[in-house]
């Protein structure tokens, strides 16, 4: 009989091991055997909890997107009466949370983005994440701008966030958070009306 609570512990071990494997050898070269070895479990455990490698990769992407959602929501909940500018910066800062800009997370996101073009489930998850970001940004800009301008500003800020993130990921260096904050803050203030 399995120990109570073991499923969540095992799932976490396997997701963490998957992130480590992707970080070290890439998604396509990360095998079930390597992941199981890193997690200290048998390959059968992966099949038991996730069916196969694709199921494990999907769960890993869901985990990363959940961490992103939580990072943004925690910052927004801390600003219930915040201005549009403050809330937009909170969304930006959530996207640059350590859970999203660590080496392992960045490599995993890049691998998932590339694979999402060929795997419908990963594509769907990527689209949900992208739409959520754009929706949050447009909603906050719309507090101060007409709908069309809010959509354009939201799209521009989403592109800036993705661009800063992608440049950092491809450089192999940590994201320069002060620079990212400064550039995104400048974009936000340039698009919001002044009092």
Curated annotation (Swiss-Prot):
Q: Which keywords label this protein?
A: DNA-binding, Repressor, Transcription, Transcription regulation
Q: Where does the HTH tetR-type domain start and stop, copy by copy?
A: 8-68
GO BP annotations listed: glycine betaine biosynthetic process from choline; negative regulation of DNA-templated transcription
DNA-binding region range list:
31-50
* SUPFAM superfamilies (UniProt xref): Homeodomain-like (SSF46689), Tetracyclin repressor-like, C-terminal domain (SSF48498)
Q: Which GO terms describe its molecular function?
A: DNA-binding transcription factor activity; transcription cis-regulatory region binding
Which pathway is recorded for this entry? Amine and polyamine biosynthesis; betaine biosynthesis via choline pathway [regulation]
User: What is this protein's function?
Assistant: Repressor involved in the biosynthesis of the osmoprotectant glycine betaine. It represses transcription of the choline transporter BetT and the genes of BetAB involved in the synthesis of glycine betaine.
Record-linked HAMAP family: HTH_type_BetI (MF_00768)
Name recorded for this polypeptide: HTH-type transcriptional regulator BetI
Q: Which organism is it from?
A: Escherichia coli O17:K52:H18 (strain UMN026 / ExPEC)
- This protein's gene is called betI
């Amino acid at each position: 009989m399995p120990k109570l609570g073991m499923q969540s512990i095992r799932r976490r071990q396997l997701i963490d091991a998957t992130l480590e494997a992707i970080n070290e050898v890439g998604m396509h070269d990360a095998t079930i055997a390597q992941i199981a070895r890193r997690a200290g479990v048998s390959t059968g455990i992966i099949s038991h909890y996730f069916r196969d490698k694709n199921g494990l990769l999907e769960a890993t992407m869901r985990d990363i997107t959940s961490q992103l959602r939580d990072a943004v929501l925690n910052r927004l909940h801390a600003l219930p009466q915040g201005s549009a500018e403050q809330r937009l910066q909170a969304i930006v800062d959530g996207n640059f949370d350590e859970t999203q800009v660590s080496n392992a997370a960045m490599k995993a996101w890049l691998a998932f983005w590339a694979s999402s073009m060929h795997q419908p489930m990963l594509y769907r998850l990527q689209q949900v994440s992208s739409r959520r970001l754009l929706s949050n940004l447009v909603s906050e800009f719309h507090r101060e701008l007409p709908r069309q301008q809010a959509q354009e500003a939201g799209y521009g800020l989403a592109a800036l966030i993705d661009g800063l993130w992608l440049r950092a990921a491809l450089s192999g260096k940590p994201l320069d958070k002060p620079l990212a904050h400064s550039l995104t803050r400048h974009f936000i203030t340039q698009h919001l009306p002044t009092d």
